Amino acid sequence: MKPKRTILCADGNEQALSIRKILLETRGYRAICCTRAEQALEHLRDHQIDLVIADLMLPDLDGSRLIEAVKIASPQTPAILLSTRLNIFEYETHADVFLPKNAQSSAELLGHVRALLVRRRGPRKTLVAPSVPRTAASPNFAVARA
């Protein structure tokens, strides 16, 4: 059985956090939930985190600043920033993906989670058969015509 990917979720809204936790865990991910950025940074130091999902409006720190701290500590960790504010682009953010909090569907969020985790892992390795020299006896032999 492959190990579960760990996703760190930070949101000041406990109800939104519990919904997100259920959504992620029913899809086979391990979700660590925090209501404060300080807690999230402690978990980042203590655990291997594969992805971060943060709300822009956290009680103790701006979510984009949390993601900036994540990227400084672990540059390869992908991050999704959620916000009810649509003018997020006025912020300089280090997030890989921005999703409007009220408009996002579960399928959209999960699609971004999967895509970012695949991008972090890299493409699946495919086995390549060793090259066999082509000869006149092989069925793939081609003759160049002049």
Regions found by a protein language model. Give the residues of each.
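The feature encodes the CheY-like receiver
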Residues: 59
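Alpha4 helix (beta4-alpha4-beta5 surface) of REC/receiver domains from two-component response regulators
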Residues: 65, 81-111
